[in-house]
Swiss-Prot record:
Record function comment: Plays a role in the inhibition of host RLR-induced interferon-beta activation by inhibiting the phosphorylation of TANK-binding kinase 1/TBK1, thereby blocking IRF3 activation and preventing the establishment of an antiviral state. Also blocks IFN-triggered nuclear translocation and activation of host STAT2.
Gene Ontology CC, one term: host cell cytoplasm
Protein name stated in the entry: Non-structural protein NS-S
Keyword Transferase annotated: no
Keyword Nucleotide-binding applies: no
Keywords carried by this UniProt record: Host cytoplasm, Host-virus interaction, Inhibition of host innate immune response by virus, Inhibition of host interferon signaling pathway by virus, Inhibition of host IRF3 by virus, Inhibition of host RLR pathway by virus, Inhibition of host STAT2 by virus, Inhibition of host TBK1 by virus, Inhibition of host TLR pathway by virus, Interferon antiviral system evasion, Viral immunoevasion
Biological process, per Gene Ontology: symbiont-mediated suppression of host cytoplasmic pattern recognition receptor signaling pathway via inhibition of IRF3 activity; symbiont-mediated suppression of host cytoplasmic pattern recognition receptor signaling pathway via inhibition of TBK1 activity; symbiont-mediated suppression of host JAK-STAT cascade via inhibition of STAT2 activity; symbiont-mediated suppression of host toll-like receptor signaling pathway; symbiont-mediated suppression of host type I interferon-mediated signaling pathway
Assembly description: Interacts with host TBK1; this interaction antagonizes TBK1 phosphorylation and inhibits TBK1-IRF3 interaction. Interacts with host STAT2; this interaction blocks the nuclear translocation and activation of host STAT2. Interacts with host TNIP2.
Signal peptide coordinates: none
Involved in inclusion bodies formation, as annotated region: 66-69
Amino acid sequence: MSLSKASQPSVKSACVRLPIVVLEPNLAELSTSYVGLVSCKCSVLTCSMMRKMKAFTNTVWLFGNPNNPLHALEPAVEQLLDEYSGDLGSYSQQEKSALRWPSGKPSVHFLQAAHLFFSLKNTWAVETGQENWRGFFHRITSGKKYKFEGDMVIDSCYKIDERRRRMGLPDTFITGLNPIMDVALLQIESLLRVRGLTLNYHLFTSSFLDKPLLDSLYFAIWRDKKKDDGSYSQDEGARQDDPLNPLDELLYLSDLPKPLAHYLNKCPLHNIIMHDEEVREAYLNPIWGKDWPALSSSP
C-alpha cells in the first residue's frame, strides 16, 4: 500500500472518509488527504523507515513518543539545549543565516521551545491550549496553507526528514517524528557547521549503540574528522594549539554527573581507562602483573 494523496475529496465528506492523524499527547485528531496511514507497533520508529515502507504512522507525538527509545532524552541533550537557548541577538550575522531554516527567516523559536519543553519539562501551555501547537507546523512548512491540517503535520515530518538527509545525519538521531526537538537539533547542527564542526550525535541518543567505538566525549567534533569511522579519538588534540579552536568553547560530557556504568557498554576499555581515575589506577597497578604470563614463557 503506497502513501499518496487522495484525489480532491469534498470538504463535507472529509471527516467521514479521510484518514485521521492523531497528534499526541491528546492534542488533536486531524483529517488528511494522505492514504496509507498505519498503526505501527514497532517502538523504534523513524520517518525514513516509514517512507521506505511507502506508508506513514497515524500518530505523531509533538514532544516525542515516550515509548520510542530513539526519543529518550539523554542528560547531554538537556545541557546542549541550555547552551543554545539564548536570544537571536546573541548570534552573529552568519549564524543568523544558518537559522533561516525552516521558516525562511532567522529564528530561535524552536531552540527556545525545545529548551522549555525538554530541559525545563514545561509543556503545560501547549497541553492546555494556551499556546497553539499549529504555530510549530506553520513554521516548519513555511506558512503554506493546507485544506487539511493532517497534511500539514505529515508534510512537516517529511520536510524534517529531507533536511536530515541533506545534512547527512542518521535517522536514529533525527527521527522526523519528534518535530520540535528534531528542528532544534538540526538548527544546532547548522550553527556548528558555520564553525566547521558537527554534532557528535552518538552522545545524544541510543544511535551510539550502533558504533562500538566512542572515543570523543565532546558534544561537537570537527567535520573532517567525522568522515573516517575510527577517527573520533583525539579530535580535540589535533588542533589543540590553535588559539581560536572552537572546541575550547564546547561542552564536554565529563561535566555530567553520570555513573561509570553508563559507559560500560558504550566505550572500549582504553576509553574508560583514559577518563576514569580509579579504573586507571587499578589497571596500572603492578600487583596484577603476576596474573599475566611472562613474555619469555612458552605457550
